[in-house]
Design a protein with these regions (language model features):
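Flavin (primarily FAD) binding-site architecture
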Residues: 240-253
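Flavin (FAD/FMN) cofactor-binding and adjacent substrate-gating region
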Residues: 103-177, 182, 191, 214, ...
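Dinucleotide-binding Rossmann-like beta1-alpha1 core, especially the glycine-rich loop
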Residues: 58-142
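Glycine-rich FAD pyrophosphate-binding loop
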Residues: 35-56
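Short hydrophobic core segments
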Residues: 21, 232-243
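Core beta-strand elements of the Rossmann-like FAD/NAD(P) dinucleotide-binding domain
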Residues: 14-16, 227-237
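C-terminal catalytic lobe of FAD-dependent flavoproteins
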Residues: 165, 173, 248, 255-300, ...
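Extreme N-terminal leader/targeting segments of oxidoreductases
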Residues: 1-18, 33-37
């Protein structure tokens, strides 16, 4: 379904059951959950699907061994259950991945083994595989790239997925179920009205009405970022799922709701870790873990946890973060990567929820739990969380809206636990014109046309960063293909 089709559908309808603002993991999940229950849903995303933090993750579906060590047992248990759900419902985009955890002492050996035993115990029937111990004599065969001196390795299982691909799958699933979803559609303000009155000619922009009491959110004012046209849409329930931008859509509040943390990643050639399994570096100098992962015939290393002052549409990793990742990986790999080996550097900004986000708290100590709350004007906000638990978050948001009677509470709940997602793949375009004209490995002219016509890609970045992942894999090669991608998109009317 093309973006133009979605725009026409939105133009034919001004009133909805709910409006979701934000097309990342959280907003897309909510749109699917609401649509499967039969609500009329409008989803608006200022940029591309998963154009912010949701496409800049470490590509893992996991409970989080670090969160287990920090005592976030509920988060870990929920995430391990949801990990299996995502892999089952989006099997072409997600898979189990084995990890190795190096141990250099007897203490490390038993600590890691006991910790992973607890990790598997929390997974219960959702376990992806048993952990195992490989002694030093087996390491040379299993993972010879590791530095010598190891006592052995603990192996365990987690999940890996295509974050941007899953976002597109959720968009397709939501629209198949009846939602209208538009990317590159920026919400300018929340509309409000006096409680109990119809919206006609009474709605105000939030900025014009914050001094008035008893006003309720009744819709949004939004702009098509491509045409410049401004529209209004109305709904008794407006959900703010904008991640780190959550406070920008809210009326004035007493305290900031989120703290921000930047996570940087680097990509190097496969030769540094030529395995189908990943490695977790259990203890960096700042107390985090670091991952070394096989990813699209390359190696992904990350991530960092750097406090930052706010959201950025295009966050950049610092030189210190780049050096940190290289140094920490070099402590464990016999051949340490250098700056010259780095093909791409990129970062995402996490939104972390704590009781008072204005307090100076180490972001490493803040869990990845999510929070759902309602402002005085009725705007529903959701922040925090992680990709692995997106479905659970969406389910809880809709229960919250029903409990507060923002949507019809008589509509029965419907579980999405076994809902197969529409994982659109370009295979059917293999015989289309341009299929043999390759711009990058895996990126043909036909693929670019598929991105525009099927996935609502509207910019070169949409194609190179999120439909393919070349901008994250090898920025230089992606840049060299940008002009050809733009030419094909222009032929498609974009």
């Amino acid at each position: 379904m093309t973006r133009d089709t979605q725009l026409r559908a939105a133009a034919q309808q001004s009133e909805w059951d709910l409006i979701v603002v934000g097309g990342g993991a959280t907003g897309l999940g909510i749109a699917v959950q609401a649509a499967v229950q039969g609500y009329q849903v409008l989803l608006l995303e200022a940029g591309d699907w998963a154009g912010g933090t949701s496409s800049r993750s470490t590509k893992l579906l996991h409970g989080g061994v670090r969160y287990l060590a920090q005592g976030h047992l509920g988060l870990v248990r929920d995430a391990l259950q949801e990990r299996q759900t995502v892999i089952r419902n989006a099997s072409s985009l997600a898979k189990p991945l084995q990890f190795v955890l190096p141990a250099y002492s007897v203490w490390d050996q038993w600590r890691y083994r006991l910790g992973l035993w607890a990790y598997e115990g929390l997974a219960g029937n959702a376990s992806l595989g048993e952990s195992a111990w490989l002694d030093a004599s087996e390491v040379a065969t299993h993972s010879p790239e590791l530095r010598q001196g190891l006592r052995g390795l603990v192996t365990y299982w987690d999940g890996q997925f295509d974050d941007a691909g899953l976002a597109v799958a959720l968009m397709h699933t939501a629209t198949r179920l009846g939602a209208v979803a538009i990317n590159h559609a920026q919400v300018l303000s929340v509309l409000t009205q006096p409680s109990g009155l119809a919206h006609q000619n009474l709605a105000h922009d939030r900025d014009q009405s914050t001094e008035r009491e008893n006003l309720r959110a009744c819709g949004v004012r939004w702009r098509d970022q491509l045409s410049g046209d401004v529209h209004q849409a109305y709904a008794p329930c407006v959900i703010n799922a904008t991640g780190g931008w959550v406070d920008g859509l809210r009326a004035a509040s007493n305290a900031r709701s989120v703290t921000w943390s930047r996570g940087a990643h680097i990509v190097v050639r496969r030769e540094f870790w030529p395995h189908a399994h990943g490695m977790i570096i259990p203890r960096t100098r700042d107390g985090r873990v670091l991952f070394v992962l096989p990813w699209l015939d390359h190696v992904l290393m990350g991530t960092t946890d750097t406090p930052c002052d706010g959201m950025d549409a295009h966050p950049r990793a610092s030189a210190q973060e780049l050096d940190f990742i290289l140094e920490e990986a070099g402590r464990y790999l016999q051949r340490a990567p250098t700056r010259d080996d780095v093909l791409s550097v990129w970062a995402g900004v996490r939104s972390l929820v704590q009781a008072n986000a204005s307090l100076q708290t180490s972001t490493r100590s803040i869990g990845r739990e999510h929070s759902i709350w309602q402002d005085a004007n009725g705007l529903v906000n959701v922040a925090g969380g992680k990709w692995t638990t997106y479905r659970l978050m969406a389910e809880q948001v809709m229960k919250f809206c029903c409990r507060h009677k923002l949507v019809n509470p008589n509509i029965p709940e419907v579980s999405t636990r076994h809902l197969a997602l529409d994982c659109a793949l370009p295979d059917a375009w293999a015989d289309r014109p341009g299929a043999s004209i390759e711009l990058l490995p895996g990126v043909s002219e036909a693929f670019v046309r598929w991105c525009v016509q099927v996935t609502s890609a509207q910019t070169v970045e949409d194609v190179l960063a999120r439909r393919s992942r070349w901008l994250l894999l090898d920025a230089r090669r992606a840049s060299q293909a940008a002009a050809d991608v733009a030419r094909v998109m222009q032929e498609e009317g974009v």
